[in-house]
Amino acid sequence: MKASMFLALAGLVLLFVVGYASESEEKEFPRELLSKIFAVDDFKGEERGCKGFGDSCTPGKNECCPNYACSSKHKWCKVLLGK
């Protein structure tokens, strides 16, 4: 009974997300959603002088903010995991 309720709730959440995505006219919905999920004080983008999550960067130039690293494969700032 608990599992079926959980699955029903998960299905409703998924339906809500898909419905919101289909109504969104912006083509950058996945990036917008990820930036809202992983937002870490992105309100001061120009003031801080570094690039936040998802911003394009050049590998080896240390342009990303602390706790972010420039991905050499995708060439955008991502969350730094580990040391």
From Swiss-Prot:
InterPro entries: Huwentoxin-1, Huwentoxin_CS1
Sites of Leucine amide modification: 81
PROSITE patterns: HWTX_1 (PS60021)
Compartment(s) of residence: Secreted
UniProt keyword annotations, A-Z: Amidation, Disulfide bond, Ion channel impairing toxin, Knottin, Neurotoxin, Presynaptic neurotoxin, Secreted, Signal, Toxin, Voltage-gated sodium channel impairing toxin
Signal sequence extent: 1-21
Alphabetized GO MF terms: ion channel inhibitor activity; sodium channel regulator activity; toxin activity
Tissues in which the UniProt entry reports expression: Expressed by the venom gland.
Propeptide: 22-48
SUPFAM superfamilies (UniProt xref): omega toxin-like (SSF57059)
GO cellular component terms, semicolon-separated: extracellular region; host cell presynaptic membrane
Pfam families linked: Toxin_12
Cysteine-cysteine disulfides: 50-65, 57-70, 64-77
Family from the record: Belongs to the neurotoxin 10 (Hwtx-1) family. 15 (Hntx-3) subfamily.
This protein's domain notes: The presence of a 'disulfide through disulfide knot' structurally defines this protein as a knottin.
Subunit organization: Monomer.
Its job: Lethal neurotoxin. Selectively blocks tetrodotoxin-sensitive voltage-gated sodium channels (Nav). Does not affect tetrodotoxin-resistant voltage-gated sodium channels or calcium channels.
Protein name, as recorded: Mu-theraphotoxin-Hhn2d
